[in-house]
């Protein structure tokens, strides 16, 4: 327990933990003696972050420097998604992905490829014929194999692990009715893993999803993973995306999922991790009352009040204790962005909203 508390204390000193507030940048400039995230957790798990193209290229030099100092694993936020890397059937765009992999290699980092199959940000041509109708099963299998073999093959021996399939299960445990599912059924998932393993037999392969604390989704993921293992299809880890807030998910429920996933024999990875200090978006809010709506969703435009900051830190400490309790099965914790300024939730669902 003392060891855990010392590590958590170190982390808290970094002002913002893995959400990495803007003060993190100032801390990085003050002294080289303070503990880094990767050093503080070196006996527990890899500490990772998502990089955008500006950080990879060095245009955001401070963001890149912070990432290299505090993390030992990186994932491309968007550069390897289908719509970006394979925008047309016979054309690939490699510049951003190549630069990302080189940055990781040059700095001895554990490199994650994200993601090979995802219904969102899928290239518009991928699932349809010249008339805009769904392609047949054999055509999609051929396209899927070519896409995965080309990308994974290009980075064979360089990218250490791949998010092969992303977000294929919905909360009630049914399969998402994506184009991949409509055309190939459940089989598109094991096929994707099979193709990835063919392209690089040494790479780790992951299934990644959000809301993994939800029992319906949890149960189906466990069944799916066990089925693939029984068929001899390689899958190394289950990624729990972990977009958290001050009161969600319930940590007991989250732990139940973590233990269930570990029970498959897979490793568990905390992926796309962030923890918002802002109120949960209320789908029933009166959006016609623009002023009240914006105030409700963006209550701290000038910074977090001290009591909210303290509550956030306490919540973060509880989350980190949970991760460390299960460091025997958790092999990586990846923050979704280097700083609050990089959050995918800034300006959503109202313009000017600041994410903390």
For each predicted feature, which ranges?
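Aromatic-lined carbohydrate-recognition surfaces of secreted/lumenal glycan-active proteins
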Residues: 48-53, 164, 192-217, 269-272, ...
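Acidic-and-aromatic substrate-binding clefts and catalytic sites of carbohydrate-active enzymes
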Residues: 50-63, 82-95, 169-174, 211-219, ...
């Amino acid at each position: 327990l003392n060891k855990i508390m010392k590590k958590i204390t170190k982390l808290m000193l970094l002002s913002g933990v893995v959400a990495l507030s803007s003060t993190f940048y100032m801390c990085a400039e003050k002294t080289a003696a303070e503990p880094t995230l990767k050093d503080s957790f070196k006996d527990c798990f890899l500490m990772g972050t998502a990089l955008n193209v500006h950080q990879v290229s060095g245009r955001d030099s401070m963001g890149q420097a912070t990432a290299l100092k505090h993390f030992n694993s990186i994932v491309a936020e968007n550069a390897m998604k289908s719509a970006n890397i394979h925008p047309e059937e016979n054309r690939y765009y490699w510049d951003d992905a190549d630069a990302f992999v080189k940055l990781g290699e040059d700095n001895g980092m554990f490199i994650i490829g994200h993601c090979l199959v995802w219904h969102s940000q899928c290239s518009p041509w991928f699932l349809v014929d010249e008339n805009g109708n769904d392609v047949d099963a054999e055509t999609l299998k051929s396209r899927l194999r070519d896409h995965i073999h080309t990308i994974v093959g290009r980075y064979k021996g360089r990218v250490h692990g791949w998010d092969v399939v992303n977000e294929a299960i919905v909360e009630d445990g049914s399969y998402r009715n994506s184009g991949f599912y409509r055309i190939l059924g459940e089989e598109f998932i094991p096929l994707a893993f099979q193709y990835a393993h063919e392209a690089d037999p040494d790479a780790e392969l992951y299934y990644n999803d959000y809301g993994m604390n939800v029992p319906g989704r949890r149960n189906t993921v466990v069944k799916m993973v066990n089925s693939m293992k029984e068929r001899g299809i390689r899958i190394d880890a289950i990624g729990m995306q972990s977009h958290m807030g001050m009161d969600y998910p319930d940590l007991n429920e989250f732990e139940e999922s973590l233990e269930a996933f570990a029970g498959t024999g897979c490793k568990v990875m905390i992926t796309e991790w962030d923890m918002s200090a802002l109120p949960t978006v209320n789908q029933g809010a009166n959006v016609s009352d623009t002023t009240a709506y914006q105030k409700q969703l963006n209550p701290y435009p000038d910074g977090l009040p001290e009591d909210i900051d303290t509550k956030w830190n306490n919540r973060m400490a509880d989350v980190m204790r949970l991760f460390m309790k299960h460091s025997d099965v958790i092999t990586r914790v990846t923050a979704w962005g280097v700083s609050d300024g990089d959050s995918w939730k800034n300006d959503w669902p109202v313009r000017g909203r600041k994410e903390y």
